[in-house]
Design a protein with these regions (language model features):
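A glycine-rich helix->loop->beta "capping" turn
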Residues: 49-50, 70-82, 89-90, 116-119
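Conserved glycine-rich Rossmann-like NAD(P)H-binding loop of the short-chain dehydrogenase/reductase
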Residues: 24-39
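Canonical Rossmann dinucleotide-binding motif of NAD(H)/NADP(H)-dependent dehydrogenases/reductases
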Residues: 1-28
Length: 186
């Protein structure tokens, strides 16, 4: 069985990482837009990579689990690349929190349960999480450690506490950094 790389988000950054790190691996590429995933698949297969695609929504735990199950059928999961997300200029606050914040937290949690010892992962994020007012130590801890199904219930993430889509995006990116830190030591 091959080592498996899970790639979420069929964009150019994800493809560049997969091309650099995915030689001799089975690559499972998931995206909400299956046509985007198929286009990246074709480019990569034409270049000699072994890629399968799956339609999946990062905001859905069920879709994440379906993708992980697919990956496990091909071998040992050794790598995760998360390049999925929505833009603050193109999505409402609720979608930003559900995809960029909650979805990334669920993905890290679920892949963390199955990735092989010595496995690696990268979550493409943004410096935007550092371009807002400083959070308290408690807020940072909550973003890092709150169980995923309770994450969107945090006071800091309630609509009345979020100024606009940019602020939601900044909070999501801060949460991404904190979740990666917390998951990396489990």
């Amino acid at each position: 069985m091959k080592e498996v790389m899970i790639v979420v988000g069929a964009g150019q950054i994800s493809m560049a990482i997969a091309r650099r790190m995915g030689a001799s691996k089975k690559i499972i590429l998931g995206d909400k837009n299956i046509e985007n995933a198929k286009n990246i698949q074709k480019t990569m297969v034409d270049a000699g990579f072994d890629v399968e695609v799956i339609e999946m929504d990062l905001s859905s735990r069920q879709d994440i689990l379906k993708m992980i199950d697919m990956a496990k059928n091909y071998g040992l999961i050794k790598m995760l690349v998360n390049g999925a997300g929505v833009s603050p200029s193109q999505a409402p606050i609720e979608a930003i929190l559900k995809v960029d914040l909650y979805g990334t937290a669920v993905l890290l949690e679920e892949v963390g349960k199955v990735i092989e010892e010595g496995g690696v992962g990268v979550t493409i994020s943004s410096q935007s999480g550092w371009r807002m007012e400083q959070l308290t130590a408690l807020e940072d801890e909550q973003l890092a450690c709150t169980p995923t199904e309770e994450l969107l219930d945090l006071e800091i993430l309630q609509p009345e506490n979020i100024k606009d889509t940019l602020h939601a995006y900044q909070l999501a990116k801060r949460c991404n950094e904190k979740r990666v830190m917390a998951e990396s030591v489990k």
